[in-house]
Regions:
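Conserved acidic catalytic loop of the alpha/beta-hydrolase fold
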Residues: 153, 164-183
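Catalytic active-site module of serine/aspartate enzymes centered on a nucleophile-bearing elbow/loop
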Residues: 377-422
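Conserved hydrolase catalytic core segment
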Residues: 183-220
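N-terminal cap/lid subdomain of alpha/beta-hydrolase-fold enzymes
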Residues: 73-147
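Short alpha-helix in the alpha/beta-hydrolase fold that links the catalytic acid
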Residues: 334-337, 360-370
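Short beta-strand/loop motif that positions the catalytic acidic residue
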Residues: 350-352
Length: 422
């Protein structure tokens, strides 16, 4: 096989795939049998944990965090060999709450459909770790935390971050948990970037990387969307040069607008047409005296923006979108992704979605091409979906089969079941 020149079909391509599923001879429309599980299966009530790390963390920008906190959740049990750990890496606005429910909150985690007993990321087989990364705003050290040098919130003074900073912080949590090697590092979007970075920074610390709806670097269009969102935030009078917490303010309108911009890019035109079309919420296009005329899609975006601005921090949004812009997996390898992936030792599963235009399937095929050229074991599946970039978070039978089948084989290779000898 000439890996340099092989073209990847638009629907599915698998190279050196683990032998559980012979997808080279199987269409994703064909049945692939996995254990049945009811749609309402859940790990149940979960409790977040917090780790205070005393070990200094030197960031890529040169700044040293003498200490930092990480909030995380775990699901399932670690086996006696401590070999069944899976790290979940969240995307831009994600957090540690990937699955289950809180005692006082009935809303499930952001990946509830995929994490739990009998689900694709099976907590009967794996010990799953989901962490809120530094720079975010859900309890881990970030812009809303107190700067020990000033006694005030970090705000816009929080140091710039790179994906490798998240990886190094996650590694400290890994050591705290007594895990020497992840069975898999799994993530979508920015989470997939972290999985790839893990494979280069610590190639002996993971057996598999699952990269979903991601890219080796952002396109100019993606960077442009991020800059427009940041400008929306900074244009809010309540932004106060990023020191809004000191003034007991928050740029809610700017952050809501930023989220509205982002949300449009996460959906496909087809889905928006199906969901909203040109339906009106209030007003009448015929009656010119009716003001304002409001389309359903306007109402939806306004709701999403307002909800997001009430729960996320503007400085965190700016910080993490800049981290996305800066991400370039092969930059220190003379911009040669094949040379970059030559350092990886793990197996890869790369997944993309047909209607995703924010992280288009072409980006995933570029990852797969580079991995094949580097001689790595890689499986690639493009999932048919009309859900756009958000498809990686939403139910999809073929997606479940591809992800669940791959991880089922990973579990079989581990041998020792979860909870043995514990």
């Amino acid at each position: 096989m000439n890996r340099q020149s092989e073209k990847i079909p638009a629907s599915i391509c698998c190279v050196n795939f683990l032998p559980l599923l012979d997808l080279m001879h199987t269409s994703l429309s064909d049945p692939i049998m996995l254990p049945d599980h009811p749609s309402d299966t859940s790990i149940g009530i979960v409790t977040p944990q917090s780790l205070h790390i005393e070990q200094p963390l030197k960031l890529a920008c040169g700044v040293v965090l003498e200490t930092h906190d990480l909030v995380y959740e775990t699901y399932g049990e670690l086996n006696s060999a401590k070999s069944n750990g899976i790290l979940l890496c969240h995307a831009l606005s994600g957090d540690h709450h990937a699955a289950g429910f809180y005692q006082d909150d009935s809303r499930p985690g952001w990946w509830e459909h995929y994490v739990g007993p009998g689900k694709p990321i099976d907590t009967d087989k794996f010990f799953v770790v989901s962490v809120n990364n530094i720079g975010s705003c859900f309890g881990s050290t970030g812009p809303t935390s107190i700067n020990p040098d000033t006694g005030k919130p970090w705000g816009s003074d929080f140091p710039s971050l790179r994906a490798r900073d998240w990886v190094e912080s996650q590694k400290l949590l890994m050591e705290h948990l007594g895990i020497e090697c992840w069975a898999a590092v799994v993530g979508g979007s920015l989470g997939g970037m972290q999985a790839m970075r893990w494979s280069l920074e610590h190639p002996d610390k993971l057996l598999n990387a699952v990269v979903i709806a991601s890219s080796m670097k952002l396109t100019a269009q993606n960077i442009a969307f991020n800059e427009i969102a940041r400008r929306a935030i900074k244009s809010d009078p309540d932004f106060c040069d990023g020191r809004y917490l000191e003034h007991n303010k928050a740029p809610l309108k700017g952050l809501a607008l930023a989220r509205m911009i982002g949300h449009v890019t996460y959906l496909s035109d087809e889905l928006m047409g199906q969901k909203f079309g040109r339906q009106l919420r209030i007003g009448d296009l015929i009656d010119r005296n009716t003001d304002p005329i409001e389309f359903q899609v306007e109402s939806y975006l306004n709701y999403q923006g307002d909800k997001f601005s009430d729960s996320f921090d503007a400085n965190s949004y700016i910080l993490i979108t800049k981290m996305l812009d800066y991400f370039d997996l092969s930059r220190e390898y003379n911009s040669d992704p094949v040379a970059a992936f030559a350092h990886a030792k793990c197996n890869f599963l790369v997944l993309s979605f047909s209607s995703d235009w924010r992280f288009a399937p072409e980006r995933s095929r570029e990852i797969t091409d580079a991995l094949m050229s580097a001689g790595k074991s890689v499986s690639y599946v493009e999932i048919e979906s009309d859900k756009g970039h958000d498809a990686f978070l939403l139910p999809n039978e073929r997606y479940e089969k591809a992800l669940g089948g791959y991880l089922s084989r990973v579990a079989n290779r581990l041998g020792a079941p979860a909870g043995d000898g514990q």
